[in-house]
Amino acid sequence: MLIIAGLGNPGPKYAGNRHNIGFMAVDAIQRRQGFSAWSRKFKSEVSEGEIDGERVLLMKPQTFMNLSGEALGDAMRFYKLAPKDIVVIYDELDLPAGKARIKTGGGHGGHNGIKSIDAHCGKEYRRLRLGIGHPGVKDLVHAHVLGDFAKADQAWLSLLLEAIADNAAMLVKGEDSQLMNKIALATGGKPETEKPVAVKKQAAQSHIHQARATAQPKKLPVTGPMADMLKKMFGPKGD
């Protein structure tokens, strides 16, 4: 079993906020994958279904962002799950709008919802971070996060959410690299490729070393005064 939790704040006042992109993502999965209607459990709205043969519980904690860990912790203990059985989807200020990154574990990066989940569930769960961009000035962060997506954002936002919903099986199976490529292609970015292994260059040699390495032994003279002198010193060759 896997829990996929999207983070956000409950109520219509916050529904269109950038901070609620996690809610939007699990809503998209619920619609696309034909999950059950939303119901209330674990201080959350929950929806159940199967993806690629795996039982999945979608969650939208209704505790407000800063207490998200309470809801997720209740569900984790009820189903006797480990942190590795949890995926959390949430907004990321430090990623450009429309970009996505996924990893297991790490710090909370100042995100209060993640800070709460770390405290209640441990840190070794998978984190799908969805970029909402940074306003550029620290004083504007609060208004940016709790502000609604602009009309200009709707194009990339729809593509991002659709890509997550369409490729939810990759999320469930842990095919993280493939998922990132699918999202990048769907949103007009370039697929991520493995960096080529750098070929180690041979250390530069001094001109003296190079000369020694390439120098060929000189042939001894077989005729003439020098040859006669060598024969007297060492005897004729072949004796």
From Swiss-Prot:
Its main location: cytoplasm. InterPro entries: Pept_tRNA_hydro (IPR001328), Pept_tRNA_hydro_CS (IPR018171), Pept_tRNA_hydro_sf (IPR036416). The record marks D91 as: Stabilizes the basic form of H active site to accept a proton. The record marks N9 as: Discriminates between blocked and unblocked aminoacyl-tRNA. It is an enzyme of class 3 (hydrolase). It comes from the Bacteria. It is found in: Cytoplasm. It holds the Pfam family Pept_tRNA_hydro. One of its GO terms (biological process) is protein quality control for misfolded or incompletely synthesized proteins. TRNA binds at Y14, F64, N66, N112. It catalyses: an N-acyl-L-alpha-aminoacyl-tRNA + H2O = an N-acyl-L-amino acid + a tRNA + H(+). Its EC number is 3.1.1.29. The active site is at H19 (proton acceptor). The keyword RNA-binding applies. Keywords: Cytoplasm, Hydrolase, RNA-binding, tRNA-binding. The keyword Iron does not apply. GO terms for cellular component: cytoplasm. Hydrolyzes ribosome-free peptidyl-tRNAs (with 1 or more amino acids incorporated), which drop off the ribosome during protein synthesis, or as a result of ribosome stalling. Catalyzes the release of premature peptidyl moieties from peptidyl-tRNA molecules trapped in stalled 50S ribosomal subunits, and thus maintains levels of free tRNAs and 50S ribosomes. Monomer. This is Peptidyl-tRNA hydrolase. It comes from Rhizobium meliloti (strain 1021).
